């Protein structure tokens, strides 16, 4: 028996459900893909637009990284290393002590002998001459602390100089302290300077003494410089606000703020480097001790 051919229109009708099902499945897949892509697109754009900002390092982080990298420089590039750490101290007041110690170490390591003492004295004189912006930013209590610290150091150095025959450099150093106190008192509400301070311990140990902060034996002029640096470090720490920056009057602009910060950092580094050049041990553990008096 022969099989009758199926009419063409009947074959199409029998295959239509299968074809329609395939087309429907393909359409649904395309629709789902479009929804998925449209749903994911905003997230991708959000990440690409905002993540770089969230990961961008702060000014402090950038300055600290550059300072750490500068440690690879050679000894003859100590000024560059010191400046990198000075900038880190300006940008990271919460790490003021550590950064200023590194800056002073870099300066002291590159120098030696009488020439370095003259250079360090000049640096201190110049730093003192730039203290006016800091004087404007200091509240009364901290101004008294900074002024008295500088004035006492100037007096003590002048007393030591009077006992020596070749102490012209020490008188110049004493004058720098006195000038710093004078500039700082220029914007103070009162003058806390005593002019004369106790000398019993000083005269008992005019050449070498013990640092009460850590028990280290050091030349007396070096300890005077280190104590002055520590006094200013304490002032700087108390000036640090909750945002990690030096507090200034609301009317002061960004430039005045920057100048006050720079003046404080430069003076601390000048005192520290002078202390090291005069014989204070240049180890970080000794330099970061807090004085007990």
Each predicted region: which residue ranges?
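All-alpha RGS (Regulator of G-protein Signaling) helical domain and cognate RGS-like helical scaffolds
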Residues: 41-293
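Bacterial N-terminal signal peptides that target proteins for export
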Residues: 6-28
């Amino acid at each position: 028996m022969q099989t009758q051919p199926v009419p063409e229109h009947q074959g199409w009708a029998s295959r239509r459900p299968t074809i329609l099902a395939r087309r429907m499945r393909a359409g649904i897949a395309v629709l789902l893909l479009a929804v998925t892509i449209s749903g994911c697109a905003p997230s991708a754009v959000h990440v690409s637009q905002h993540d770089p900002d969230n990961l961008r390092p702060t000014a402090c982080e950038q300055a600290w990284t550059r300072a750490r990298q500068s440690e690879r420089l050679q000894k003859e590039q100590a000024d560059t290393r010191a400046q990198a750490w000075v900038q880190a101290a300006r940008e990271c007041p919460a790490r003021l002590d550590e950064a200023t110690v590194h800056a002073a170490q870099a300066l002291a390591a590159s120098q030696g002998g009488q020439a370095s003492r003259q250079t360090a004295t000049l640096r201190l004189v110049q730093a003192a001459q730039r203290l006016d912006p800091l004087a404007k930013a200091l509240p009364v209590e901290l101004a008294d602390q900074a002024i008295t610290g500088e004035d006492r150091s100037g007096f003590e150095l002048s007393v030591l100089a009077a006992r020596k025959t070749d102490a012209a450099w020490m008188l110049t150093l004493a004058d720098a302290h006195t000038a710093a106190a004078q500039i700082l008192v220029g914007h103070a509400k009162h003058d806390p300077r005593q002019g004369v301070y106790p000398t019993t311990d000083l005269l008992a140990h005019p050449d070498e003494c013990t640092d009460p902060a850590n028990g280290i034996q050091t030349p007396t002029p070096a300890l005077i410089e280190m104590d002055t640096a520590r006094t200013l470090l304490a002032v700087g720490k108390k000036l640090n606000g909750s945002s990690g920056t030096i507090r200034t009057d609301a009317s002061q602009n960004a430039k005045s703020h920057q100048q006050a910060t720079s003046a404080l950092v430069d003076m601390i580094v000048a005192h520290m480097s002078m202390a090291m050049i005069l014989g204070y041990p240049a180890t970080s553990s000794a330099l970061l001790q807090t004085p007990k008096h």
